[in-house]
Amino acid sequence: MKSINITGARGSLVIDDTNAHTGLINEYINVTEDTVLSVCTGVDGKGNAVNFKTLLNWDGTLTVNHNPLTVPRGYKINAITLTSGEIVVR
């Protein structure tokens, strides 16, 4: 189930399924339960494509202890796909 909660200008998106979520413009991920991401991509400040798993040398595993996961300043998350778990992107 996917739900959208509006909080501020851009709002937030709860992701708790394994569908590809694209067209995002987010800077951080709140982890609501232990999660595995198969895809986490975006752009840097110049608009160049970035794979955050590669950039951050990260296997895609998030636990509630990772709250929140932020991308470097000026970068944006634009696509996320989960293998399991639940997150809120903002």
List where the protein language model places each region.
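Generic detector of intrinsically disordered, low-complexity, polar/charged segments
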Residues: N5-G8, A20, V39-D44, N57, ...
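Beta-sandwich interaction modules
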Residues: S12-D17, K53-N78, S84-R90
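Exposed regions on extracellular, virion, or secretory-pathway luminal proteins
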Residues: A20-T22, G45-V50, T61-T63
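Extracellular/lumenal ectodomain signal focusing on beta-strand-rich modules
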Residues: E27-Y28, V39, A79
